[in-house]
């Protein structure tokens, strides 16, 4: 007999060889039905793995994040199974879980398009209803290679060859087998709420020199209600797509001459300036001085900073006069150079620097997505140089600033996470231990709840992440606060302590809105283009019922501009209904409509974008009304 301890501290006795599914059944049939896998002594295992010794057990159900991930990964296998049934000559490659779903890459021998997805989805449903048990076997590497080679799965053979392990797991459901680390669901019958969403091209291993594969995306949920809710959200997200709205509002465009880099138009720059000016004022409030540093630096600087060894594949390089240069992918190394121009005492610290720094990163062309994923962007970077004793206080101030900024921009629902050390990193474990604990202490001191993200920190230090929830429930990773003991040391940053000794300052990296391009894209989608008055590129459109009011329209327009209102004058010889409709489609918050009566009485008639009539008032009263709304960030 063995003893199994549960999360509530209770201990129960079972026969050796029992599995997690059996344990769940002994508690309740409904729990067994919901069980996807289990943590056995903190190791995630398949629900049917035998338990042969005393252990701690935590059952994973579809309600747990891990359970939903397992469900989606298993659905990717179901997709591959269906494809092999319908198109037997197809080679399967990889099928990972992604946000809200999964994808699988295939090498089809025939042409496949979006129109084929319903057929594949129908086959998936047929296979799921078979309630096929899902099992695995562990085989030597050579045997796995022979198994997949016999099936003509050359991509699987290549994957196995690239894995250092000598033992491979092969999962099987019905007549389909796939290479996978697992775990997977116990039975295909739990896959009931899924849908294939789109089809795209993808190079094998992300390398454009390799074969172009067909990538099929899908989504999978615990219940049909959850699936329906997600599909409704996708439909709403399509309406809010910043690329479409950006075109309608004439904000920006992209073209192949400069892939992944936006061309900003007048209206887009107006929004940009509001975001940048707001952040500049916020930085001033929190004691940051503003700097500006070079876009290009000698490659030796990036070698010293660690970027050359850890980030080279994302960097753009160039040569001049027999020297190697790199376009900066991050602003921090050049900021340190500003710090290093002076001798600093501990009394000078903390020193807070802010920069709206343009960076370039060589993102794969297939990953580019409007303003949300670009190759060139401007970061609202801040770098704070401080003593170890000042870290927690500085982080607390940064957290307060982040909360303040997000609320002003209309994001009131956000989560805080700490991304911990990744495998590919610089610095020793002792330094990482200290860094991670400092961030935890700062959040604890501020009574901020947070989630830990193992392995997701930057290569030079752990970071606090801010995830904002938008109007339709999507989560966006936005600002970061990163703690760095390594870079200031590598780049020779020092200060003189109270004993007259040289010390290396702690460097705090922070971005609040992050990429301005991405943040503006988020704002457009969050508000569906109906930006609040203080951010709107055009706040008021002035128009006359006929050309007889042109002079009065100009007079009102000038008065609005003198009061700092971003106004547009529409004197076109068009019907007033046409003008109202056009400016409504352009999401202008307020329309000023002037006719003979308004001209004679020197008043204005105001209509909101929503169609609500605000009646008549003087221009001065209207300006005061607008100013109050702008100051309140409404």
Swiss-Prot record:
GO molecular function terms noted in the UniProt entry: ATP binding; metal ion binding; threonine-tRNA ligase activity; tRNA binding
UniProt cofactor(s): Zn(2+)
Binding site for Zn(2+): 332, 383, 509
Reactions it catalyzes: tRNA(Thr) + L-threonine + ATP = L-threonyl-tRNA(Thr) + AMP + diphosphate + H(+)
GO BP annotation list: threonyl-tRNA aminoacylation
Cofactor binding mode and count: Binds 1 zinc ion per subunit.
Class of the enzyme per the UniProt entry, highest EC level: ligase
Region (Catalytic): 241-532
Keywords of the record: Aminoacyl-tRNA synthetase, ATP-binding, Cytoplasm, Ligase, Metal-binding, Nucleotide-binding, Protein biosynthesis, RNA-binding, tRNA-binding, Zinc
One Gene Ontology cellular component: cytoplasm
Localization per Swiss-Prot or TrEMBL: Cytoplasm
CDD domains: TGS_ThrRS, ThrRS_anticodon, ThrRS_core
Keyword Nucleotide-binding: yes
EC number(s) recorded for this UniProt protein: 6.1.1.3
HAMAP family from the UniProt entry: Thr_tRNA_synth (MF_00184)
Subunit structure as annotated in this protein's UniProt entry: Homodimer.
Family: Belongs to the class-II aminoacyl-tRNA synthetase family.
Name of the protein in its database record: Threonine--tRNA ligase
Species, as recorded: Francisella tularensis subsp. mediasiatica (strain FSC147)
């Amino acid at each position: 007999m063995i003893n199994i301890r549960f999360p509530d501290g209770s201990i129960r006795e079972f026969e050796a060889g029992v599995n997690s599914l059996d344990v769940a059944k002994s508690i309740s049939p409904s729990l067994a039905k919901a069980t996807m896998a289990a943590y056995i002594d903190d190791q995630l295992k398949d629900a049917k793995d035998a338990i042969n010794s005393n252990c701690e057990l935590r059952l994973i159900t579809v309600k747990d994040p891990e359970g939903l991930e397992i469900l989606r990964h298993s659905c990717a296998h179901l997709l591959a199974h269906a494809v092999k049934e319908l198109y037997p000559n197809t080679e399967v490659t990889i099928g990972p879980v992604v946000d809200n779903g999964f994808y699988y890459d295939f090498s089809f021998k025939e042409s496949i398009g979006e129109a084929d997805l319903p057929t594949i989805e129908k086959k998936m449903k047929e296979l799921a209803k078979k309630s096929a048990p899902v099992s695995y076997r562990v085989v030597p590497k050579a045997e796995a290679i022979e198994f997949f080679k016999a099936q003509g799965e050359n991509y699987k053979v290549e994957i196995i060859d690239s894995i250092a392990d000598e033992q491979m797991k092969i999962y099987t459901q019905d007549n389909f087998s796939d290479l996978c680390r697992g775990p997977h669901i116990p039975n295909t019958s739990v896959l009931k709420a899924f849908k294939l969403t789109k089809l795209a091209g993808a190079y094998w291993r992300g390398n454009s020199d390799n074969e172009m594969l067909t990538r099929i995306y899908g989504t999978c949920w615990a219940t049909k209600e959850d699936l329906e809710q997600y599909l409704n959200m996708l439909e709403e997200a399509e309406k809010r797509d910043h690329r479409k709205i950006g075109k309608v509002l004439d904000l920006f465009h992209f073209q192949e001459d400069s892939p992944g880099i936006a061309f900003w138009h007048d209206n887009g720059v107006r929004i940009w300036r509001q975001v940048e000016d707001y952040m500049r004022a916020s930085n001033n409030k929190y004691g940051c001085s503003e700097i500006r540093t070079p876009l290009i630096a000698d490659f030796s600087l990036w070698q010293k900073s660690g970027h050359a060894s850890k980030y080279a594949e994302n960097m753009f390089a160039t040569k001049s006069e027999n020297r190697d240069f790199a376009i900066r992918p991050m602003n921090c190394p050049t900021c340190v150079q500003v710090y290093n121009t002076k001798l600093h005492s501990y009394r000078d610290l903390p020193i807070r620097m802010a920069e709206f720094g343009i960076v370039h990163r060589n993102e794969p062309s297939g990953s580019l997505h409007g303003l949300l994923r670009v190759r060139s962007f401007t970061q609202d970077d801040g770098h704070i140089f401080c003593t170890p004793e000042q870290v927690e206080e500085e982080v607390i101030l940064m957290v307060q600033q982040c909360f303040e900024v997000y609320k002003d921009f209309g994001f009131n629902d956000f989560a805080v996470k700490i991304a911990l050390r990744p495998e590919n990193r610089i610095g020793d474990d002792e330094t990482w231990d200290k860094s991670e604990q400092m961030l935890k202490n700062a959040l604890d001191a501020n009574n901020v709840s947070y989630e830990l993200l193992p392995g997701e920190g930057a290569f030079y230090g752990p970071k606090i992440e801010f995830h904002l929830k938008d109007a339709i429930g999507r989560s966006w990773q936005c600002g970061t606060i990163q703690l760095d003991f390594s870079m200031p040391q590598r780049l020779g940053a020092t200060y003189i302590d109270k004993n007259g000794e040289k010390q290396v300052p702690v460097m705090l990296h922070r971005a609040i809105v992050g990429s301005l391009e991405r943040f503006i894209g988020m704002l457009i989608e969050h508000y569906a283009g109906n930006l609040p008055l203080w951010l709107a590129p055009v706040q008021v459109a002035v128009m006359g019922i006929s050309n007889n009011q042109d002079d009065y329209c100009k007079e009102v327009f000038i008065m609005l501009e003198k009061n700092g209102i971003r106004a547009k004058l529409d004197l076109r010889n068009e019907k007033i209904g046409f003008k109202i409709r056009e400016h409504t489609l352009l999401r202008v918050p307020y329309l000023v409509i002037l006719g003979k009566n308004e001209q004679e009485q020197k008043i204005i008639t105001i209509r909101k974008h929503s169609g609500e009539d605000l009646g008549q008032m003087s221009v001065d009263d209207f300006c005061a009304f607008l100013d109050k709304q702008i100051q309140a960030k409404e």
